[in-house]
Amino acid sequence: MKRLLFITICTLSCILCGPLAHKAAAQTYASDLHHTTHEERAERRAERLAEYAKQIDSIVLSHNFEFNPQSVQLQPAGTLNLLSNANYTVFVWRGSLDICLPYYTGIVPPYRYVLLNTGTPNISDYVTTQTDYGWTVSFKATLYATDEYTFLFEIYSHGGATLTITNTWYNPVQYMGTISQIY
């Protein structure tokens, strides 16, 4: 009788505690699996970002790239306007500049919205500097025969770029977009 009672108690305790023990083991396994896959994803992401940073370095050091803006803003604190025209670009190629961008002229409101659509065969004071976040590229170009514009690219190693165009007569205009390689 004692044996029967002992076997019954053991059986009932196994029935009641078995799923709990199995569930705890399954949670531990799932947690370990999650940490493993999370670490693997983090490693793959770090590898992709390092590869992309190398690609950006190559593009900047070649001095041949294309800037595709996605937004424009008059500085300081102008309204941010999104750009949807695929023809708005800046090409820097072998010491020359080809530009097609909207631009704000005027010192006080109302500002005029004009199009910088020109090219110049020579740019001057070309300076490339590596920073903590990526690269800074600056140069000067004379557009429309007499007006000197300063171009400042802030190129981020994890994607994206900012272009600020300044002129002696007008407020700076800032563009945000992407940098790509010219083939």
Language model regions located:
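N-terminal secretory signal peptides
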Residues: D32-V108
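Short, low-complexity, polar/charged sequence segments that are solvent-exposed and flexible
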Residues: S84-V90, T118-G119, Y156-A161, I182-Y183
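Short solvent-exposed loop/turn micro-motifs enriched in small/polar/acidic residues
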Residues: N81-S84, P121, Y144-D147
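Bacterial Sec-dependent N-terminal signal peptides
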Residues: M1-L33
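Mature extracytoplasmic domains of secretory-pathway proteins
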Residues: T89-Q130, G134
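A short, polar/proline- and glycine-enriched secondary-structure boundary/capping micro-motif
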Residues: G78-T79, V108-Y113, P172-T178
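Helix-rich interaction surfaces within compact, conserved domain-sized segments
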Residues: D32-L33, S124-Y183
